[in-house]
């Protein structure tokens, strides 16, 4: 996108010769050089020169030419009445749009009409309902840097404002992934990877340093929200909020605002309205909520589908959304993106949901009443900015009228949250009564053309209307009286906006025209006249109409201002109605889809018959599965103490999950995460029973693709995500790993997978689900005291593989990769050749991985591994054991040489075969202090030396 969108260079050269109107346009383009200026000329918004070419191309409208004393130049115009759709197109193309309106009445100005930029439309500062396109929040973010990053977010359309500070670039990305801002401004001190932090869809602008200056930021925060030192924690947050407010003022055209380049912007008028409704700032600490980083938000498909195929494009928020109003939809999204860590708050939500679930009649009545609630947050935003029309006020009054009924349905509530809502729902009776007394029930869209104020509200307005009406009645009677007086039966009395009232006589009757008729207009077949009496009545009507319209508009504005004074109360009411709507929605989902009330605060994840909330809606027969992780004592290494816990006492907290593709591994792992997330958001969960811990974070390493633009391969992306998990996961985290180690050699992949498994088990102790096709890894799980093997069962019918989607103990006996290839439509010749190669691999060491793998013993480390039951001399078996690896008959090779070396760790036999230097290096490694990456590098070095 060009840095400036103003007129081309020739206009600068001809600046002194420009017409007054084009000089005005050029000056606005220069002042708002970061935006595309749409310049009102009558009923159109025009763009000229280079900007006209862009507008015509993007909006698919005709490019014309304008000619004046300076020559010809391109021009493109869009009708004001349909401007929103064209503005949306320009926004989608990545442009900001500066709206320059006529701020004078052309009929009252002899020279050029004055114009001013009344608002700047950007992706993150939309307030127009037509452009917002839905109930979801539309945030603009501001970021500053220092010892910590300061982050502020604002939805101008609703007034929602948040602020926080974090310590790293990745933490900034995590917080932004929660809110998904459409636009961001950054201070001059911010140096981050834009795509990685903000994402490619976010419009990012480097804003002027003065806007982020500490003193100015403190003044702005204080002006809107109160003393910043009481609201925010540190200068970074204050600077971020100050810069964000400065940008909001700039886009609203506020007097004294500062543009991106630091230059003051001081238009003559402020039609976009004030930001006085911004009166509540929420400062939050990310550590108070379950942390969902950008990877988890994407892979769990909380708010956006990764693929447009399947599942009816449903996300989690779509699936559990039974909210009745826009307020509830936004609040639901907020609760899901910030699951709670406080058990009392979680239980309070569950208690309210339980009471509503038990009472379907109340739930249905509340839902019906909430469906009558308009979007109060956006309504009061428009009211406060002076952009609301009479219909907006009636919508607000209609919402207030249902609040008493909502309160009545909560009068007998026992649940704490419901009782609190009953006590605090404010019906704003005086505000509703004032609106209903002043505004007609079905007012026109425009507030300047009359018909807005009720009769009886204002005596002077009633008098003017009476004068206007009596004058029109006199005119209505004039036609009959003049026909009688003149004897002209075809005589008509009419009105045009240009010539006013007239008496029309056809040419055939001109001889009968009285002397007091004065000619007003000549037509082809008739003449139009007026009389002194008609002119007098017309002037009287026009004076009354004009005075009534002016008075009516003044009265409307006064009512609107009174409502704006109650903005804080309206916003508080909106928040409470939104919370109630979400609780009712949770209860409705629980009742319709058989969700259970979870118990939170347990020592482990214990789910009976759990289901994936999204997938179960799209499949006729979803197979539920149990999950049991870490509900017993933990290994000594998890809490740093040695309390005498033995391997026999440990309930596994790490599960290695095997099974063919399409068997359900990924769905199952995501299902566990979504159940935990829903529970901590306050919802019931899709299961028969659920005892859950309070998770501090959910990590996902599920699927990846190349980042070609960033120069990162799939494997590099996977390792980067893995490093984040190993560095940040705690014993209270849930880790989902799917196929770690792809994109490199089998030996490297197995080595990494094993090292990661051991580190998560020995050092982190996080609740972990590790899906893999590396069946050698099942031997590692069998040897770890806090780990277990689980697999998805398959069966055969008439030689075909059937996926049962049932989770069972032990590892899978085979991968069924060839069968899956056949089901996918791979040519028969390739499938048959694959079967031949696989058969060879099962009978000889050909370097092709077999489908059944040899159990390899691993000597346990004291206090963390099981021992005797995984001895390498165990009885030969051909099927999976309860927790052991699937084993093949003695002597049957099942994996390539490198993979066997990685997993052959049993005692002196292997060590005797190692070169002495390798053995010495191996003995010198301090495994207890090595990081996972250091361990992987050391292992790779040893492999190179052995080879």
UniProtKB/Swiss-Prot annotation:
SMART domains with a match to the protein in the record: MUTSac, MUTSd
Key word Lyase present: no
Chain sites annotated for binding ATP: 659-666
Keyword entries, A-Z: ATP-binding, DNA damage, DNA repair, DNA-binding, Nucleotide-binding
Annotated segments matching region Disordered: 623-643, 841-916
Listed Pfam families: MutS_I (PF01624), MutS_II (PF05188), MutS_III (PF05192), MutS_IV (PF05190), MutS_V (PF00488)
Keyword Nucleotide-binding: yes
Annotated coiled-coil segments of the chain: none
Matches recorded under InterPro entries: DNA_mismatch_repair_MutS, DNA_mismatch_repair_MutS-lik_N, DNA_mismatch_repair_MutS/MSH, DNA_mismatch_repair_MutS_C, DNA_mismatch_repair_MutS_clamp, DNA_mismatch_repair_MutS_core, DNA_mismatch_repair_MutS_N, DNA_mismatch_repair_MutS_sf
Domain of life: Archaea
BP-aspect Gene Ontology terms: mismatch repair
An example molecular function term from Gene Ontology annotations: mismatched DNA binding
Task performed by this protein: This protein is involved in the repair of mismatches in DNA. It is possible that it carries out the mismatch recognition step. This protein has a weak ATPase activity.
HAMAP family: MutS
Family stated for the protein in its record: Belongs to the DNA mismatch repair MutS family.
Protein name as catalogued: DNA mismatch repair protein MutS 2
Gene name for this UniProt entry: mutS2
């Amino acid at each position: 996108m060009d840095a400036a969108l103003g007129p081309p260079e020739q206009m600068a050269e001809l600046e002194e010769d420009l017409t007054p109107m084009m000089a005005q346009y050029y000056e606005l383009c220069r002042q708002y050089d970061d935006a595309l200026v749409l310049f009102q000329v009558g009923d159109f918004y025009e763009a000229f020169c280079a900007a006209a070419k862009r507008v015509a191309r993007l909006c698919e409208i005709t490019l014309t030419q304008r000619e004046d004393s300076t020559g010809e130049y391109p021009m493109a115009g869009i009708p004001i009445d349909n401007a929103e759709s064209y503005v949306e197109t320009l926004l989608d193309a990545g442009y900001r749009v500066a709206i320059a309106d006529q701020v004078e009445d052309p009929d009252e100005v002899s020279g050029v009409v004055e114009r001013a930029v009344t608002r700047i439309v950007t992706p993150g500062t939309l307030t127009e309902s037509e452009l917002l396109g839905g109930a979801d929040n539309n945030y603009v973010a501001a970021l500053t840097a220092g010892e910590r990053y300061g982050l502020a977010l604002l939805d101008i359309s609703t007034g929602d404002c948040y602020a926080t500070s974090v310590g790293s670039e990745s933490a900034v990305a995590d917080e932004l992934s929660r809110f998904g801002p459409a636009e961001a401004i950054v201070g001059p001190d911010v140096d981050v990877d834009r795509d990685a932090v903000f994402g490619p869809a976010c419009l990012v602008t480097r804003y002027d340093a003065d806007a982020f200056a500490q003193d100015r930021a403190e003044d702005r925060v204080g002006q809107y929200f109160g003393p910043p030192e009481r609201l925010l924690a540190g200068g970074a947050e204050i600077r971020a909020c100050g810069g964000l407010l400065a940008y909001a003022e700039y886009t609203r055209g506020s007097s004294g605002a500062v543009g991106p380049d630091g230059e003051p912007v001081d238009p003559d008028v402020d039609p976009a309205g004030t930001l006085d409704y911004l009166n509540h700032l929420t400062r939050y600490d990310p550590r108070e909520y379950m942390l969902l980083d950008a990877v988890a938000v994407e892979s769990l498909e909380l708010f956006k589908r990764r693929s447009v195929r399947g599942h009816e494009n449903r996300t989690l928020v779509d699936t559990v959304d039974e909210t009745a109003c826009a307020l509830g939809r936004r609040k639901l999204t907020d609760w899901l993106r910030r699951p709670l860590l406080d058990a009392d708050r979680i239980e309070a939500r569950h208690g309210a949901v339980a009471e509503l679930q038990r009472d379907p009649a109340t739930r249905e009545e509340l839902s019906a009443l909430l469906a009558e609630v308009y979007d109060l947050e956006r309504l009061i935003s428009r009211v406060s900015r002076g952009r609301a029309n009479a219909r907006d006020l009636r919508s607000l009054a209609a919402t207030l009228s249902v609040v008493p009924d909502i309160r009545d349905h909560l009068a007998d509530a026992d649940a704490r949250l419901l009782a609190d809502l009953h006590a605090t729902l404010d019906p704003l009776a005086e505000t509703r009564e004032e609106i209903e007394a002043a505004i007609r029930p079905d007012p026109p869209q425009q507030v300047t053309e009359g018909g807005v104020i009720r009769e009886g509200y204002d005596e002077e307005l009633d008098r003017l209307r009476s004068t206007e009406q009596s004058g029109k009645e006199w005119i209505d009677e004039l036609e009959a009286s003049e026909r009688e007086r003149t004897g002209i039966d075809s005589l008509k009395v009419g009105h045009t906006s240009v010539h006013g009232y007239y008496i029309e006589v056809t040419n055939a009757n001109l001889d009968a025209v009285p002397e007091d008729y004065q000619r007003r207009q000549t037509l082809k077949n008739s003449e139009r006249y007026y009389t002194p009496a008609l002119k007098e009545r017309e002037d009287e009507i026009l004076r009354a109409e004009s005075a009534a319209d002016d008075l009516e508009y003044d009265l409307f504005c006064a009512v609107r201002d009174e409502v704006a004074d109650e903005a804080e109360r309206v916003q508080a009411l909106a928040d409470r109605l939104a919370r109630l709507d979400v609780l009712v929605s949770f209860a409705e989902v629980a009742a319709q889809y058989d969700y259970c009330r979870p118990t939170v605060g347990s020592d482990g994840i214990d789910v009976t018959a759990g289901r994936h909330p999204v997938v179960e809606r799209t499949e006729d027969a979803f197979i539920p599965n149990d999950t049991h992780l870490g509900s017993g004592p933990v290994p000594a290494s998890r809490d740093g103490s040695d309390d005498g816990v033995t391997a026999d006492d440990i309930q596994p907290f790490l599960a290695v999950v095997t099974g063919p593709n399409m068997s359900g591994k990924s769905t199952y792992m995501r299902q566990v995460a979504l159940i935990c997330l829903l529970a901590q958001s306050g919802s019931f969960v899709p299961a028969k029973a659920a005892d859950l811990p309070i998770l501090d974070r959910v990590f996902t390493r599920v699927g990846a693709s190349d980042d070609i633009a960033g120069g990162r391969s799939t494997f590099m992306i996977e390792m980067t995500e893995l490093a984040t998990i190993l560095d940040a996961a705690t014993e209270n985290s849930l880790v989902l790993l799917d196929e770690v180690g792809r994109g490199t050699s089998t030996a490297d992949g197995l080595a990494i997978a094993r090292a990661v498994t051991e580190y998560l088990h020995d050092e982190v102790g996080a609740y972990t689900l590790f899906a893999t096709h590396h069946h050698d890894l099942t031997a590692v799980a069998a040897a770890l005291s806090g780990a277990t093997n689980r697999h998805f069962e398959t069966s055969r019918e008439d030689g075909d593989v059937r996926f049962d989607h049932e989770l069972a103990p032990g590892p899978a006996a085979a991968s069924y990769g060839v069968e899956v290839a056949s089901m996918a439509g791979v040519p028969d010749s390739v499938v048959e050749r694959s079967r031949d190669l696989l058969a060879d691999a099962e009978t000889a060491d050909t370097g092709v991985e077999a489908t059944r793998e040899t159990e390899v013993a691993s000597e346990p480390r004291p206090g963390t591994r099981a021992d005797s039951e995984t001895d390498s001399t165990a009885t030969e078996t051909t099927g999976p054991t309860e927790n052991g690896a699937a084993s093949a008959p003695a002597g049957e090779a099942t994996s390539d040489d490198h993979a066997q070396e990685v997993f052959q760790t049993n005692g002196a036999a292997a060590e005797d075969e190692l070169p002495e230097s390798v053995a010495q290096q191996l003995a010198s490694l301090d495994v207890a202090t090595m990081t996972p990456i250091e361990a992987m590098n050391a292992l790779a070095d040893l492999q190179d030396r052995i080879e």
